[in-house]
Amino acid sequence: MRFLATANAEGQPYIQHRGGPEGFLKVIDPHTIGFVDFAGNRQFITSGNLAENPKAYLFLIDYTHRRRVKIWGTARIVEGDASLTADLMPAAYRARAEQVILFTISAWDANCPQHIPQRFEAKDVAKALAERDTRIAALEAEVASLRQGQ
């Protein structure tokens, strides 16, 4: 999960989930992360905040591996750059790109896993269950074959 926090000129904070497929955050250079900002709730609070105050914060959490990373920096909106949007657009992702956000890193920290509940994506659980079911079916077939041989 990825969250982007911003604040307006008066310091009023705002945090918003930023969705996209795995790998949609792209490293541009050692100090810059870029990503396509997809059409969403149409409130444009993040865009308004960044127009007034470029300070921003990324909070990344991986529930499966119980890891989190906090990234401080500044962000800016890039609109109308078709080449940059195409470079950052995840392959085969069908959401509508609205703009690009470029995030310049000033500091980051990886936290300990304490108190992070472990959670799994439904697709990963389905895959593990399918593998288990396949193994059970093979074992049941082997047992049936052994019983017939007695």
Please place each PLM-identified region on the residue numbering.
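Binding-site signature for planar aromatic cofactors or substrates
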Residues: M1-Q150
